[in-house]
Amino acid sequence: MSKKKFIVPALLAGSAAVAAYMFAKNNDTGEEVPDDCYVFDNGKHCAVYRERGPVNVTMIGGRHTGKTDLVCDNILSANKSCVVFDKNGEKYRNLKETLKNSGFAVGRINLMKEHASVYNPMSFLEDDMDVITFVRYLMDIQLDGETDFLRKAEEMFLSACVHYLMQYKEDADIHMLYDMIPAVENEGDYLVDDDALTKTTQLFSVLDETSSAKRYYKAFLQAAGLMINETLVKCKERLNMLLPLDGDYEDESGIVDLRDKKEAIFVTFPADEYYTPAHEFYVKSFMTHLFKTLTNVNAEKLQDSDPVCIFVDDYEYVKNTDMFVGTASILRKYRVSLFATLSNVLLNDADDVISLLSCSNACVYLGGCRDSYAEHFLAKYFDTDCLIDAIKIKYVD
């Protein structure tokens, strides 16, 4: 195999602290470890090449294989802004004070129902394209591949609602998208007559003809034709999806520009059965805002700056929010480094895993996956020349 540089699971180049920790804990060879190296369980150490730019790493292993510890070690050794997807808020509670003492501004986008500081994606919509993107995310999450012949009409109505919020929320008791539900329902539980249509018409009829909300509402009427009520029923279902995240929706994210200062943003969300489509919707909205923020940075500043790091522990909980792991080109464009861990590699998740691995400079398998398919899948995906004892690394030119 030709000589190639390779990347190891250390997104944050220059973190001698993690190297020393891993060396003291796991290395029995007695070798001297260079400052820019990281040591793993078998005593092997690999160089980190600082000039390579963003580093995207995937770590795969079962329970109790040390994935979370490695994530936390890398977060604490950060020397640049980072975003941490934080299941149940554990990392926020454990790391926030240490990060503050290290000079970070620590923020939190909290999607946990029992807390109040919930992220409001409406705060960052600025133009028609933002609105359309926002609405399509909301619809796609619920469609789950099914064909919806009312899709165009739904898209126009939901866009009208969003534009209404953007333009008139200062003068109304409407701050979040689901606050529009009263505009599409009557006194009963379901839309069974024209009362709701009358109420909706009253809401938009008083608006100026030049307003975007009025323009999209007219487009909705044209697209829906004789199926206006049926369209409103579907729209109400989509708005109802957001109800589980009830709370105080004052924007407390504190995000201005992750490249202007060292900032650590924790996106906390519930795991297991408490993780709903609404959480996915808010996470996708946040990632849209994050990438838009990075896009707005001028090219010269973007080139000279360190990449923002994204940490995702237990990727399977956020795998459907794959807009930030879809292709390596997206990550390179925005100079975003990704550190993800995955606890299970299952047959029915193969496409999701390949999507994640395809944008990774390196993958490390820590063992411990109970499903025998995991071993077969990894052995088939990685070149056998990339095997270093129990650790499989994907090399890149």
Give the predicted meaning of each segment.
Residues M1-L12:
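Membrane-penetrating hydrophobic segments
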Residues L11-Y21, N26, F40, K44, ...:
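P-loop NTPase motor domains
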Residues N27-E32:
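Ser/Thr/Pro/Gly-rich low-complexity linker/stalk segments immediately outside membranes or between
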Residues A47-V48:
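Short, polar loop/linker segments at the starts of domains and inter-domain junctions
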Residues M112-E114, N344, C369:
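Short, solvent-exposed coil/turn elements at secondary-structure transition points
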Residues A340-L347:
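Conserved H-loop
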Residues D352-C386:
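Conserved P-loop NTPase catalytic core
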